[in-house]
Amino acid sequence: MREFVITVNSTVDLPKEWLKERNVPVLPLKYTIDGQTYQDMEGLSAKEFFQKLREGHMSVTSQINPEEAREMMEPFLKEGKDLLHLAFSSGLSETYNSMRIAAEELAEDYPDAKIIVIDTLCACMGEGLLLYKVLQLKDQGKTLEEIAEWVEANKLHICHNVTVDDLNHLHRGGRISKTAAVFGTLVQVKPIIHMDENGKLQVIGKERGRKRSLNKIVDMAVEQSEGWENDMVMITHGDCIEDAEYVAERVKEKLGNPEVLINNIGTVIGSHTGPGVVAVFLMGNKR
């Protein structure tokens, strides 16, 4: 059996050290702020980045193009390895299509290689949780094909439960409609968002006040997890660590004390959510 590598986009929003320790190659998206373009997770610190957003600075993101995708994948094929790429949701970006185009071109140049690109229909640490599960399967000795089959069967079981301070950033980035954005700007109303079966963000409710919105995404996670054993729950935040830690404690209390990984949301996805976002990701009932 040929050796294979698992690659991801930077939108997994996992700590760089975590990815490095596990030898996971990462293809970064980019963001531009104040006329400067940076790779995701590079340039500004999370605190610096979100402070700029709070001050009204705009951050614009760009997707991966096929040439960049090819440059990342080809070295592994030259080494005689097969490749599985877990791509950022096609419902939020054209990155998946760029990865797919590059893979099709590379398949002609490397006919003996297996190159699989999967549209995860996930984002942020939802992608990260999927990667966590995939690495477990690889450690268990599963083949490339077995892992790809598992991902396709289970990717819609990655639940995304999100609350934001307001929806203006998501609207500006084209991730939600103007109507939804207006809905979320009511005084003290905090939107509740999830990822649907098409990998798109949908506003599904509202709560009055921050604490209620944080409790709501935990309650959603508890309901989704019925019948599922979660050894790992992931939580991301937009420069609001106290809120993330509050959510983590409630998750541990209600879900049997799973391991919880907390990390800042990345600069690319954070460009669209804005500061103050908190999200919980876990395996659960199908979206």
Regions found by a protein language model. Give the residues of each.
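A glycine-rich beta-strand to alpha-helix segment
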Residues: 87, 116-117
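N-terminal glycine-rich phosphate/adenylate-binding segment common to multiple enzyme folds
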Residues: 68-99
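N-terminal glycine-rich anion-binding loop in soluble enzyme alpha/beta folds
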Residues: 5-68
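Mixed-charge interfacial surface used for oligomerization/domain docking
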Residues: 2-5, 11-25, 30-32, 92-95, ...
